């Protein structure tokens, strides 16, 4: 069986559904496929998002996918003294929501469908269809049969492993151990957490990573940890670190776990090349996860919108060359690469700092008004209060 579309999107996470939504809106016959039977499940996310980027992708908050609206974030150093306070007044980027990720993902897919995109679930891509050096579709298992889905443009949104991108011929990047974060999260009830703030804890409690607490409502929260795998002795280390943190904090130690989530996150540099003739990769597949925060929803959805724009241009001009695809790479790199690269270098350095140095950094930043977590502004503040740290941090300057 063969079907034909203008655009085939592989993967119905936020990036893929965003690409399908905007492609369909532009009048392109669009198919969005998802390998799992249930979009958004299983949840593999801390579920915290800021709100500053939402207007760019025309996303309006909906009560059914919001668990809690927060006023800001608090970042604690190892001693857990005065935290960095990120609020609407001094860092509006950190004001946002704790979401129900499965409902959020379904909502974005529903927006794509409402614009006219077809959606297939339990429909994995099995292989690439090529015409010469151009990607022209995929073989897909759908309703127990193999379907040749032919498309003028293919958008891969299949996560940081991006099997489809590898099958198509994109160079498979072997991630360094410093560029992979192993994560464990408990959804907990009967906890004492502040519903107005997301909390982050730095230091040896989570080597080269952090612990997060995202409130999900009254006495309920996601309590999780991400640890760079280069700091792990064995696969149980991450859970052990999280359990030790919870045990040492009475507000959480009396809580009950009702869900366990595990997974991994890539915190690498952006791919050098993430397109081929007829193929664009978006979101995690293009390695657009922020290296400092590990967050990828915003970057993914914005890149999905960009991919739809370039797909429309390519189809209108019947030009599927690498030169046309490079327009998408330029848009993505212009938007994300400078900050992304800076944050990658910062991540590399911050992972080497002692608890004592991290405490001094938090102490400095807690007294400085900043608009975002900016390496440049942090260093300026450090130079004023702890000049002896400048040499240690010189690789960030």
UniProtKB/Swiss-Prot annotation:
What does this gene product do? Is involved in the reduction of 2,3-digeranylgeranylglycerophospholipids (unsaturated archaeols) into 2,3-diphytanylglycerophospholipids (saturated archaeols) in the biosynthesis of archaeal membrane lipids. Catalyzes the formation of archaetidic acid (2,3-di-O-phytanyl-sn-glyceryl phosphate) from 2,3-di-O-geranylgeranylglyceryl phosphate (DGGGP) via the hydrogenation of each double bond of the isoprenoid chains.
Gene Ontology CC annotations of this record: membrane
Query: What name does this protein carry?
Result: Digeranylgeranylglycerophospholipid reductase
Per the UniProt entry, the Enzyme Commission number(s) are 1.3.1.101
List UniProt keywords, sorted A-Z. Answer: FAD, Flavoprotein, Lipid biosynthesis, Lipid metabolism, NAD, NADP, Oxidoreductase, Phospholipid biosynthesis, Phospholipid metabolism
Q: Which residues bind FAD?
A: 15, 34, 45-46, 48, 101, 125, 163, 284, 296-297
Q: In which pathway does it act?
A: Membrane lipid metabolism; glycerophospholipid metabolism
Say which species the protein is native to: Picrophilus torridus (strain ATCC 700027 / DSM 9790 / JCM 10055 / NBRC 100828 / KAW 2/3)
**Lipid metabolism among keywords:** yes
Task: Report the co-factor binding details.
Answer: Binds 1 FAD per subunit.
Q: Which GO terms describe its biological process?
A: glycerophospholipid biosynthetic process; membrane lipid biosynthetic process
Q: Which SUPFAM superfamilies match?
A: FAD/NAD(P)-binding domain (SSF51905)
Q: Which HAMAP family does this chain map to?
A: DGGGPL_reductase
Name the residues that span the membrane. Answer: none
Residues the record lists as binding a 2,3-bis-O-(geranylgeranyl)-sn-glycerol 1-phospholipid = 339, 375
Enzyme class, top EC level, equals oxidoreductase
Q: What GO molecular-function term can you cite, just one?
A: geranylgeranyl reductase activity
Q: Which reaction does it catalyse?
A: 2,3-bis-O-(phytanyl)-sn-glycerol 1-phosphate + 8 NADP(+) = 2,3-bis-O-(geranylgeranyl)-sn-glycerol 1-phosphate + 8 NADPH + 8 H(+); 2,3-bis-O-(phytanyl)-sn-glycerol 1-phosphate + 8 NAD(+) = 2,3-bis-O-(geranylgeranyl)-sn-glycerol 1-phosphate + 8 NADH + 8 H(+); a 2,3-bis-O-phytanyl-sn-glycerol 1-phospholipid + 8 A = a 2,3-bis-O-(geranylgeranyl)-sn-glycerol 1-phospholipid + 8 AH2; CDP-2,3-bis-O-(geranylgeranyl)-sn-glycerol + 8 AH2 = CDP-2,3-bis-O-(phytanyl)-sn-glycerol + 8 A
Q: What else is known?
A: Reduction reaction proceeds via syn addition of hydrogen for double bonds.
Question: Which Pfam families does the record match to this protein?
Answer: FAD_oxidored, GGR_cat
Say yes or no: keyword Lipid metabolism present. yes
């Amino acid at each position: 069986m063969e079907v034909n579309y203008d655009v085939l999107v592989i993967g119905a996470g936020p990036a893929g559904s965003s690409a399908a939504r905007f492609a369909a809106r532009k009048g392109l016959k669009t198919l969005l496929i998802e390998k799992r039977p249930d979009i958004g499940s299983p949840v593999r996310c801390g579920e915290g998002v800021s709100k500053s980027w939402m207007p760019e992708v025309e996303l309006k908050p909906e009560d059914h996918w919001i668990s809690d609206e927060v006023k800001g974030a608090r970042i604690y150093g190892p001693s857990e003294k005065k935290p960095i306070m990120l609020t609407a007044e001094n860092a509006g980027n950190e004001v946002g929501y704790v979401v129900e990720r499965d409902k959020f993902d379904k909502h974005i897919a529903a927006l794509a469908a409402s614009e006219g995109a077809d959606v297939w679930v339990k429909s994995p891509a099995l292989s690439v269809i090529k015409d010469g050096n151009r990607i022209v579709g995929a073989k897909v298992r759908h309703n127990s049969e193999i379907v040749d889905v032919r498309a003028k443009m293919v958008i891969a949104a299949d996560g940081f492993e991006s099997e489809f991108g590898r099958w198509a011929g994109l160079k498979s990047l072997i991630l360094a151990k410093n560029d992979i974060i192993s994560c464990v999260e408990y959804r907990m009830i009967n906890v004492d957490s502040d519903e107005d703030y997301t909390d982050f804890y730095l230091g040896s409690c989570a080597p080269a990573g952090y612990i997060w607490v995202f409130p999900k409502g009254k006495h309920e929260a996601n309590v999780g940890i991400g640890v760079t795998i280069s700091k792990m002795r064995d696969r149980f280390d991450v859970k052990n670190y999280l359990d030790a943190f919870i045990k040492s904090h009475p507000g959480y130690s009396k809580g009950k776990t009702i869900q366990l989530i595990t997974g991994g996150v890539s915190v690498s540099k952006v791919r050098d090349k993430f397109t081929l003739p007829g193929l664009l990769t978006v979101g995690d597949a293009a390695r657009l996860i922020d290296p400092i925060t590990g967050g990828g929803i915003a970057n993914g959805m914005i890149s999905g919108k960009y991919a739809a724009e370039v797909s429309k241009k390519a189809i209108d001009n019947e030009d599927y060359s690498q030169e046309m695809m490079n327009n998408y790479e330029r848009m993505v790199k212009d938007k994300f690469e400078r900050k992304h690269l800076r944050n990658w270098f910062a991540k590399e350095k911050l992972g080497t700092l002692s608890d004592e140095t991290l405490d001094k950094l938090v102490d400095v930043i807690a007294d400085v008004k900043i608009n975002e977590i900016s390496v440049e502004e942090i260093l300026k503040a450090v130079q004023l209060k702890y000049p002896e740290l400048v040499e240690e941090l010189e690789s960030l300057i």
